[in-house]
Curated annotation (Swiss-Prot):
This is Thymidylate kinase. The keyword Cytoplasm does not apply. GO terms for cellular component: cytosol. The keyword Nucleotide-binding applies. Its EC number is 2.7.4.9. One of its GO terms (biological process) is dTDP biosynthetic process. SUPFAM superfamilies: P-loop containing nucleoside triphosphate hydrolases. It catalyses: dTMP + ATP = dTDP + ADP. Signal peptide: none annotated. Phosphorylation of dTMP to form dTDP in both de novo and salvage pathways of dTTP synthesis.
Length: 212
């Protein structure tokens, strides 16, 4: 690659993004692709500290706008410190959540103004958008059941939210898919992991122009 390529992974809780990414990494490295994987919120020291505040299950009193602004602050620091340098170095950067999460969770889920969120995203990223977004779609009930069955996964504040919020979040993602279908590709995350990995690999390789 002559320049970097930015991929974001999105989806409701329990969609299995992390498991797919773990399976893809050795395949990409075998292809000789320089890959940086990172996550939001987090990715850098300041971002991880903000992540702790956002996801702490005891912070049930957090206001929706406070939550949004914390995500935006983490996003900016993460980009400047880690993502942009990697893209400038020509690497493939795969982010576990990015700008679409704010629209889905704080916009559709919390009911905050979408235009305000778009402006804040623009402000924090200087207009940077992913070259490709992989949206892992799963029914809300199935995703939450996966989380409940996974004893290794630490429960966070968002996991404790009611079913209604998670359904609104999924609708937010589907709305984004309709609006930006040229950038966002939907992947059926309810299928067995091996199939999800193969589909993701095919979509990613096609987007990057890599031979399968």
């Amino acid at each position: 690659m002559s320049k970097g390529f930015l991929v974001s992974l999105e989806g409701p809780e329990g969609a299995g993004k992390t498991s797919v990414l773990e399976a893809l990494l050795p395949i990409l490295k075998e292809k000789g692709v320089e890959v940086l994987t990172t996550r939001e919120p987090g990715g850098v020291l300041i971002g991880e500290k903000i992540r702790e505040v956002i996801l702490d299950p005891s912070h049930t009193q957090m206001d929706a706008k406070t939550e949004l602004l914390l995500y935006i602050a983490s996003r900016r620091q993460h980009l400047v410190e880690k993502v942009l340098p990697a893209l400038e170095a020509g690497k493939l950067v795969i982010m576990d959540r990015f700008i679409d999460s704010s629209v889905a969770y704080q916009g559709f889920g919390r009911g905050l103004d979408i235009e305000a969120i778009d402006w804040l995203n623009q402000f924090a990223t200087d207009g940077l958008k992913p070259d490709l977004t992989l949206y892992f779609d799963i029914e809300v009930e199935e995703g939450l059941a996966r989380i409940a069955a996974n004893s290794d996964r630490e429960v966070n504040r968002l996991d404790l939210e009611g079913l209604d919020l998670h359904k609104k979040v999924r609708q937010g993602y589907l709305s984004l898919l309709d609006k930006e279908g040229n950038r966002i590709v939907k992947i059926d995350a309810s299928l067995p992991l091996e199939q999800v990995v193969e589909t993701t690999k095919a979509v990613l390789f096609d987007g990057m122009g890599l031979a399968k």
